[in-house]
Amino acid sequence: MIAFRHVSKVFGSGDTVVRAVDNLSFECPAGGFWAFTGPSGSGKSTVLHLIAGLTPPTSGRVLVDGADVAGMTAAESAALRRRRIGYILQSFNLLPFLTARENVGMPLVLDGVRQAEVDARVNDALALVNLAHRAGHHPTHLSGGEQQRLAIARALVIRPAIILADEPTGNLDRHAGRQLMDLIGDINERTGVTVLLVTHDPVFAAYAHRVLRLVDGALGQDMALVDKRRDPARAAAR
């Protein structure tokens, strides 16, 4: 479960104060798929940074499975990101001199996981994103959609409880973006991983179970959506 309790985040001081998040409260259950939308500067990405412990709240509490993220030490916060949270960004951030397999396994190698376990987890992650047949290829030989799927596999290889996806379709065309969102929805359903998506695109936001629209850091609208995987009519419309 991810919960915000009257969370505010203020940057700057004096005449340059920016209230990125303003008294925001919500509770996302484990296994949920939620989307945050809103105009540029509405605080969407800051919400993800707060969850990951990349920035502390100015006031309020950010809870991940009951643990107060702001109360964690730097080492505890780093461990949360390394072992519990997978991050997917607009930029793929793949290392071009490594193969797809090596890119996916890198988080585990850096965490000291033994090689046999690395190999098994990488195989599982590549299969989950339908890239097992491209394991030996370098990122420069993959399409944009394949590179983003590879980035998702890298996020999944740690077997996270939470996926934070910040504009993951931003560098993809419409068709590849829809394929990616289908994949993220499928992964949420098959693995039970909690997904929090940031997107400015209402079409991609509609893949989520719930959409929170932020305006100037505050909750402007909260919409519960029908789960399209269980609604053939909406699935066809997609």
Regions found by a protein language model. Name each.
Residues M1-Y207, L214:
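ABC family nucleotide-binding domain
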Residues A218-R238:
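Conserved beta-strand-loop-alpha-helix hinge in the C-terminal portion
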